[in-house]
A protein has these predicted regions:
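Elongated, amphipathic alpha-helical interaction scaffolds
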Residues: 1-138
């Protein structure tokens, strides 16, 4: 599923799809933004709303409805030095600290700058080519 012409935070959505009951949301960032978990959370909410409507699911039933498992990835290639992989948590933005068992949403940020995440680049030559092109033009 993709959200046609859905805007959030003044940006158009990047890519989303459902494969093997997993809802993969992928976003590209060329500038560091600690609000990525919140952006992805909002985006996922829109996708789940669309999924419920398109599959004619009744949220008021007494039976648990099954939904795709979300996975949110951010591909980062900005100038700020960042680790190859980091997990950002939405709960870091909560005004009141949460305890165990409380809701959590994460963004898996993958640094796709040239020289980073070599295993990923070896598996995806298009991504590697993009990293090389960006490095040459920076």
């Amino acid at each position: 599923y993709t959200l046609d012409d859905v805007f959030y935070m003044n940006m158009k959505n990047d890519v989303s799809c459902i494969i093997d009951n997993r809802m993969a949301l992928m976003e590209h960032q060329s500038t560091w933004n600690p609000n990525m978990p919140f952006r992805g959370f909002r985006y996922a909410g829109e996708l789940y709303n669309k999924y419920v409507v398109e599959n004619d699911l009744d949220l008021n039933r007494r039976k648990l409805i099954m939904i795709p498992t979300p996975q949110y990835y951010v591909f980062y290639n900005g100038n700020e030095k960042r680790p190859e992989r980091e997990i950002l948590k939405l709960s870091d933005a909560f005004k009141v600290p949460v305890g165990e068992g409380c809701f959590e949403w994460t963004a898996t940020v993958l640094n796709i700058n040239y020289g980073c995440n070599k295993e990923l680049m070896e598996k995806c030559s298009i991504l590697e080519g993009y990293a090389i092109m960006v490095a040459k033009h920076q």
